[in-house]
């Protein structure tokens, strides 16, 4: 009989199983997946299928042949990692780069720490950031939405975040006039220039539908996504009022990977705080870091890096922000 090893607090108990929650997330991703097929067609399908298949295969192979353990593919975690990794990639990315990213996400980001429940960082973001650093040209070549039958020969275009970054660097607020209106960005702007981005980020309303579903099914709570989005909205709004070279807050929250990250990646059970107070601190810090990196960092997008940084602080948040024990009183000095 194996020993039961209990980790340090905090602990949580609920009737929901790992599989139920994982497949709840997959269902919530369906609107965004369908939107990606609509905007990017064949390219999106190829990227997502390749990413999911590679993640599932590498988890099976590492578990069976390296760790010599029983595989747990039915829990759905490898599928989610594959979907989220694929949704963070351009729809014209070469297949071999996708496979490398999947190997790094599963092998380094997840299985090297002991598998599901032990990884300190979101595996999909680990894979995405590895590819961004290793293949910056390919990872920042954005196909324009609406090219349904295109894959490797898609025409590339600028993203709203790139325009915002250029406006800040040059101090030219008139560049922001090129941005689509907020409603267009909410539903996915298309055209000769915009609608460019990763497969899962161009249609904010599809991601918000997923958020509504997960809140309804109680897969997640509101604390992390709302605190991230609200923080970015408030501070970007204040910056816009102080200096019009910074984009309006609606353009900021509907562009890039903010919605995808806030709703589906920052809310990962394993890598986010357990208490509601901790979640709010975690979300506010992610929002602030995202603004800092977007406006003054090397990359136009800062969401992935912000989440990974705060993943590292999750154990600290869990340690110092936890419920007071019943009957506990401060020690007298």
List each language-model region with its residue ranges:
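N-terminal signal-anchor module of multipass membrane proteins
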Residues: 1-56, 60, 330-333
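Cytosolic-side transmembrane-helix boundaries in multi-pass membrane proteins
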Residues: 1-23, 293-333
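C-terminal ends of transmembrane helices
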Residues: 9, 57-69, 106-117, 209-218, ...
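Structural signature of hydrophobic alpha-helical transmembrane segments
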Residues: 41-54, 92-101, 193-204, 246-258
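Cytoplasmic-side transmembrane-helix entry/capping segments in multi-pass membrane proteins
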Residues: 70-80, 97-103, 118-129, 222-230, ...
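Membrane-interface helix-loop-helix junctions at boundaries between adjacent transmembrane segments
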Residues: 84-153
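Loop-to-transmembrane alpha-helix initiation sites
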Residues: 120-124, 249-258, 279, 298-310
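Long hydrophobic alpha-helical segments that form multi-pass transmembrane helix bundles
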Residues: 123-208
């Amino acid at each position: 009989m194996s020993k039961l090893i209990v980790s340090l607090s905090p602990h949580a108990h609920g009737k929901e199983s790992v599989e139920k929650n994982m497949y709840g997330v997959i269902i919530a991703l369906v609107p965004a997946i369908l939107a990606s097929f609509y905007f990017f067609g064949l390219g999106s399908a190829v990227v997502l299928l390749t990413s999911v298949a590679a993640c599932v295969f590498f988890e099976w192979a590492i578990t069976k042949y390296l760790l010599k353990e029983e595989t747990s593919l039915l829990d759905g975690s490898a599928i989610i990692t594959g979907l989220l990794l694929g949704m963070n990639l351009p729809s014209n990315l070469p297949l071999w780069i996708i496979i490398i990213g999947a190997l790094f996400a599963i092998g380094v980001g997840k299985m090297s720490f002991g598998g599901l429940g032990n990884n300190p960082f979101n595996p999909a973001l680990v894979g995405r950031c590895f590819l961004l650093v290793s293949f910056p040209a390919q990872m920042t070549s954005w196909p324009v939405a609406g090219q349904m039958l295109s894959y490797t020969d898609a025409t590339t275009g600028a993203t709203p975040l790139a325009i915002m970054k250029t406006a800040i660097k040059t101090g030219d607020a008139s560049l922001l006039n090129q941005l689509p209106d907020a409603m267009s960005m909410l539903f996915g702007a298309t055209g000769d220039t915009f609608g460019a981005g990763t497969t899962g980020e161009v249609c904010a309303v599809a991601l918000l539908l997923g958020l509504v579903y997960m809140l309804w099914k109680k897969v997640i709570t509101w604390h992390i996504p709302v605190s991230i989005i609200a923080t970015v909205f408030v501070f970007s709004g204040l910056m816009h009022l102080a200096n019009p070279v910074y984009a309006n807050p609606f353009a900021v929250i509907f562009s890039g990977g903010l919605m995808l990250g806030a709703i589906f990646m920052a809310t990962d059970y394993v890598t986010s705080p357990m208490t509601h107070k901790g979640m709010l601190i975690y979300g506010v810090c992610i929002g602030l870091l995202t603004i800092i990196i977007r406006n003054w960092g090397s990359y136009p997008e800062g969401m992935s890096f912000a989440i990974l940084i705060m993943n590292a602080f999750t154990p600290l948040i869990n340690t110092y922000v936890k419920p007071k024990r019943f009957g506990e009183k401060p020690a007298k000095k």
